[in-house]
């Protein structure tokens, strides 16, 4: 049986859902060993790709990890650049689920050791860049920063602009995750500087735009953030990366909601963008936009509850919705409290549909922040509201007169002293 026929039979077995037979046939192709025949090498590459896809489809992550290890002898069939691409592709095949990350990190570390042994510097650097990304996804930020520092010093000596761009971008994302915003900005600037010196692939440019938008949103500059998110969305859409395009679209909607641009939000929700990515994620943002427009805490909380997986899973969305909820709660409390000089906290809670504990906590914070003036009487369970104290201008005027008189007296003393001399 020739390698070609084995590959064809394996593909047919996949189509007929005979999984075990397909796996055996793909392995038969791979077990032919190292060959200088280009045709055989191409068939082995195809078998490797198809078998890895099959393992992914069947959620057989351990088998995929073994395949990565067992395929190393075949790398002699390919150029160093091609073998590096194959190894990275195989690691990327793992599911993006959180539970598969430890195995993926283990496989990446194992491949790095192999690359060091084989003295494949370019492959090792590419794998270390991938490992940083995995550490970031796994929230192993200390490990990520340690590896970033080591890799950056090496890449700067080699002046590899492309990898420098990728690593600086990852550095920005890691620092943003640990809320070191100044370093996140500095890293992003470094990434853009490196990117300007070389051709920047659309995917990398999209990721740079996305990170730029996220940092501008953190500065509450949602107008600029929207522009970057739109650029990222256009880039990811052209690459058919639906997952990242959808995230960018959600951030675009979030920016317009935070800007209180009702017409822009409605335009986005009814336009071609929302139609293409219609689903629960877009409906979640629609519900948030509607609740914000109506200034309704009840609708806002209902949206957060009904679309919890879509809204809570994204830390960027979650962070800004928390800020939006706080602002909405403050506005509702101010509107309710305004007519009263003394009111029971339980009555306020009943009017806005929240628990007494929640309302009391928020009122305390607002008083401390001087959003309004008052005290909480714990004994009676009441909020006592005061008028904003007016500063008496007399004291300021008196202090100014005393200051001027002091200046005049000092000058008189100086003049008298000069005359005596």
UniProtKB/Swiss-Prot annotation:
The answer to whether UniProt assigns keyword DNA-binding to this entry is no
Q: Which UniProt keywords apply?
A: Proteasome
Q: Which InterPro entries match?
A: 26S_Proteasome/COP9_Components (IPR050871), PCI_dom (IPR000717), Rpn6_C_helix (IPR040780), Rpn6_N (IPR040773), WH_DNA-bd_sf (IPR036390)
Give the Pfam families listed for this entry.
PCI, RPN6_C_helix, RPN6_N
Keyword Metal-binding appears in the UniProt entry: no
Select a single GO molecular function from the record's annotations and give it.
structural molecule activity
GO biological process terms, semicolon-separated: proteasome-mediated ubiquitin-dependent protein catabolic process; ubiquitin-dependent protein catabolic process
Q: Which GO terms describe its cellular component?
A: cytosol; nucleus; proteasome regulatory particle, lid subcomplex
Q: Which SMART domains match?
A: PAM (SM00753), PINT (SM00088)
* Chain ranges of the PCI domain: 221-390
Q: Which N-terminal stretch is annotated as signal sequence?
A: none
Can you tell me which family this protein belongs to?
Answer: Belongs to the proteasome subunit S9 family.
Q: How does it assemble?
A: Component of the lid subcomplex of the 19S proteasome regulatory particle complex (also named PA700 complex). The 26S proteasome consists of a 20S proteasome core and two 19S regulatory subunits.
* Function as written in the Swiss-Prot or TrEMBL entry: Component of the lid subcomplex of the 26S proteasome, a multiprotein complex involved in the ATP-dependent degradation of ubiquitinated proteins. In the complex, rpn6 is required for proteasome assembly.
Protein name as annotated: Probable 26S proteasome regulatory subunit rpn6
């Amino acid at each position: 049986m020739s390698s070609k026929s084995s590959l064809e039979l394996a593909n047919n077995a996949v189509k007929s859902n005979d999984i075990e037979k397909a796996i055996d046939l793909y392995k038969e192709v791979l077990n032919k060993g190292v060959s200088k025949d280009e045709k055989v090498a191409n068939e082995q590459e195809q078998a490797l790709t198809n078998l890895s896809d099959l393992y992914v489809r069947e959620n057989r992550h351990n088998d995929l990890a073994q395949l990565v290890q067992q395929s190393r002898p075949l790398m002699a069939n390919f150029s160093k650049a091609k073998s590096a691409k194959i190894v990275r592709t195989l690691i990327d095949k793992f599911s993006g689920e959180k539970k598969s990350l430890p195995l993926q990190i283990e496989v990446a570390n194992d491949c790095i050791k192999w690359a060091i042994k084989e003295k494949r510097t370019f492959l090792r650097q590419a794998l270390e860049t991938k490992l940083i990304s995995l550490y970031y996804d796994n929230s192993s930020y200390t490990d990520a920063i340690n590896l970033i520092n080591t890799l950056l010093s090496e890449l700067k000596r080699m002046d590899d602009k492309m990898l420098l761009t990728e690593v600086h971008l990852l550095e920005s994302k890691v620092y943003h995750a640990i809320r070191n915003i100044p370093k996140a900005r500095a890293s992003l600037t470094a990434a853009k500087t490196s990117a300007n010196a070389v051709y920047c692939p659309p995917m990398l440019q999209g990721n740079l735009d996305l990170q730029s938008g996220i940092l501008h949103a953190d500065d509450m500059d949602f107008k600029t953030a929207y522009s970057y998110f739109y650029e990222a969305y256009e880039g990811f859409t052209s690459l058919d990366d639906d997952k990242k395009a959808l995230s960018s679209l959600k951030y675009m909607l979030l920016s317009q909601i935070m800007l209180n641009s009702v017409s822009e939000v409605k335009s986005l929700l009814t336009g071609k963008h929302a139609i293409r990515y219609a689903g629960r994620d877009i409906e979640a943002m629609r519900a948030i936009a509607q609740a914000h427009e109506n200034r309704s805490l009840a609708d806002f909380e209902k949206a957060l509850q009904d679309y919890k997986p879509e809204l809570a899973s994204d830390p960027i969305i979650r962070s800004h919705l928390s800020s939006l909820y706080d602002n909405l709660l403050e506005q509702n409390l101010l509107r309710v409290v305004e007519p009263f000089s003394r009111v029971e906290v339980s009555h306020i809670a009943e009017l806005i549909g929240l628990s007494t504990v929640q309302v009391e906590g928020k009122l305390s914070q607002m008083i401390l922040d001087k959003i309004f003036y008052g005290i909480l009487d714990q004994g009676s369970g009441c909020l006592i509201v005061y008028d904003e104290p007016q500063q008496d201008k007399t004291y300021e005027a008196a202090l100014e007169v005393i200051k001027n008189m002091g200046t005049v007296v000092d000058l008189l003393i100086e003049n008298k002293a000069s005359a005596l001399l």
